[in-house]
């Protein structure tokens, strides 16, 4: 506990295999078990992107068998996973676009054209 009354949490205190539960030090962050991650990933790969409130509750009840979990953990897992997938797609499409620009030799790039032009006579 700090002098201001805030609880200071060290990283790694929740590295147990029961999803952050247990009798050890209390941790404010959910640490999913391998089984929980596998089930969530399988649902995501099957096409579930934005589960409804009912679906979230059913999923969290199912996942609670493998360790401590709350509905908000499921909600945020899907939100984060969807955002990371979008980010990855954007990064891949940007790389493909840049690569296509670098390998397209049929049209000279603007900066190359300017560099090789003769100075204007005046």
UniProtKB/Swiss-Prot annotation:
Residues 98-122 are annotated as: Disordered. Residues 25-89 bind DNA. The keyword Cell wall biogenesis/degradation does not apply. Residues 98-111 have a biased composition (Basic and acidic residues). It comes from the Eukaryota. Coiled coil: none annotated. Keywords: Developmental protein, DNA-binding, Homeobox, Nucleus, Transcription, Transcription regulation. GO terms for biological process: plant organ development. One of its GO terms (cellular component) is nucleus. Gene3D superfamilies: Homeodomain-like (1.10.10.60). Residues 112-122 have a biased composition (Basic residues). It holds the Pfam family Homeodomain. InterPro entries: HD, Homeodomain-like_sf, WUSCHEL-like. One of its GO terms (molecular function) is DNA-binding transcription factor activity. SMART domains: HOX. It is found in: Nucleus. PANTHER family: WUSCHEL-RELATED HOMEOBOX 1-RELATED, WUSCHEL-RELATED HOMEOBOX 7. Belongs to the WUS homeobox family. Potential transcription factor that plays a central role during developmental processes. This is WUSCHEL-related homeobox 7. It comes from Arabidopsis thaliana.
């Amino acid at each position: 506990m700090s002098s201001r009354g805030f609880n200071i949490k060290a990283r790694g205190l929740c590295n147990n295999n029961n999803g952050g539960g247990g009798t050890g030090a209390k941790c404010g962050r959910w640490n999913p078990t391998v089984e929980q991650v596998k089930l969530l990933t399988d649902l995501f790969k099957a096409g579930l992107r934005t589960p409804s409130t009912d679906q979230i509750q059913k999923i969290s009840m199912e996942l609670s068998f493998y360790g401590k979990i709350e509905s908000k953990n499921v909600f945020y897992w899907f939100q984060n996973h969807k955002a990371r997938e979008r980010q990855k797609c954007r990064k891949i499409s940007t790389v493909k676009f840049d690569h296509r620009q670098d390998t397209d030799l049929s049209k000279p790039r603007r900066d190359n054209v300017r560099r090789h032009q003769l100075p204007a006579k005046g």
